[in-house]
Amino acid sequence: MSTRHLVSICALIASTTLAAPVGAQGAPNVPKLQFEKITLPNGLEVILHEDHSTPIVVANTWYHVGSGDEKPGRTGFAHLFEHIMFMGSENVPTGQFDKLLEAAGADNNGSTTTDRTNYYEQLPSNALPLALWLDADRMGRLLPVMDQAKLDLQRDVVKNERRQRYDNVPYGRANETIVAALFPATHPYHWTTIGSMTDLSAASLEDVKEFFRTYYAPNNATLVIAGDFNRDSVVTWVNRYFGGIPRGPQMPARPVVPAFTVARDTFLVQEDKVTLPRLYKTWHSVKLFHPDDAALDVLADVLAGDKNSRLYKRLVFDMQVAQDVNAFQNSGMLDGYFQITVTPKPGQTPAKMAALVAEELEKIQRDGPTPRELARSLNTRRASFLDQLASVLGKADRLASYDYMAGTPDYAQQDLARYERVTAADVQRVANTYLKQHAVVLTVVPEGKRQLMVTGGAK
């Protein structure tokens, strides 16, 4: 809340509005997902959600391991296994995993974050037994056929991915530079999911196998089956294919995040093969589901969530000095950060962008957001929730995510309720609490243009 005296009726009304929750006028309107949760004797969590609207089913397996579980000197393993898991297993020859699914009309993929690795198949209902058998075989029978040739092949694939998505993409190395500067060397988010190519090159076959034995076990996984299926048949298949996989060792505790503060503003410059410079300002913030997490999301919406947001409207539309602007709260299970990025138009400088961003931050820190801005943010959040729950794959992903990260699959309504409870005072408070801290300020510049580096105005 502002500390200014309330010297008039208008000010009193304003302060009352500032304290009013965004969603005070209605309850969250997210549909409740019906599900059944079963835990096998080997520890595998199985979540079933029936949806018979279309003859489609999704099998979505989440392993509770991400790049944040790696150790310094052993980075990139979680993402490497995302690739290795498609190579084949004891009963599935090399190259046949995708071919079998393609023949069944399936769409399948995997992804890795700081906190988890997932694999999914979306396919016709009558092909579900195939997907479950394939997933079980790679969970329980991958190591016997894991050899040096497969490791070398997938290591090269990952290195090529790094070249394509990081090293040779405009601004592709920015995030790696930022997190390395923001988080201490012992912090599990100090590196990105792609990992260090030096670490991957040095990894032995036994190193990689040990990582699999530690984390790719049924007692460290959640399997969500969503869509058009018969419950009794699915339970039979799950027990048949997964029930015999031995329980793995006791899972290591999630890494302990070292307590730290960003002691000073850090100004960095990175030359890249880009036409326009780009400014990144990043503050240490909070982890997922922290009491301030939702308010920081709303703050990001107000600043640069859409074309009506403050920074976008002023810099892109009104002044026409920026190509684009973005803001977001990045919330991991262990920690988080808040970031604003601005790409100036030709002839404009990153330093000017930094000054304009600072002006807008001062305004919201002083006055907070308007009721209209809060309502717009909440409407966007509601629409996003409903959109994600409109598909079977979206439902499966939400159920797995909530089960692991919130402790229960039944969390969609509570999740949206966090945003319903955010007040203007909350947004103003988090803007002052986190965006007045020291920041990491990175300027990505065209090659030979280091003079464009921002060297002040981090707050």
PLM region descriptions:
Residues M1-H5:
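Positively charged n-region of N-terminal signal peptides that target proteins for export
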Residues R163-N168, V179-A180, Q250-N308:
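His/Glu-based metal-binding/catalytic segments typifying zinc-dependent metallopeptidases
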Residues T114-Y120, Q148-N160:
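Short, glycine/charge-rich beta-strand/loop segments that flank catalytic centers
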Residues H49, T54-P72, G76-L80, T94-R141, ...:
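M16 family metallopeptidases and their MPP-like homologs
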Residues F77-M85, L299:
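Active-site His/Glu-centered metal-binding helix of metallohydrolases
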Residues Q148, R155, K209-Y241, A439:
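Non-catalytic, conformational "gating/processing" segments within enzyme and secreted inhibitor domains
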Residues I9-I13, T17-I47, N230-E271, R278, ...:
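Proteolytic maturation boundary segments
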Residues I84-P93:
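Catalytic Zn2+-binding segment of zinc metalloproteases
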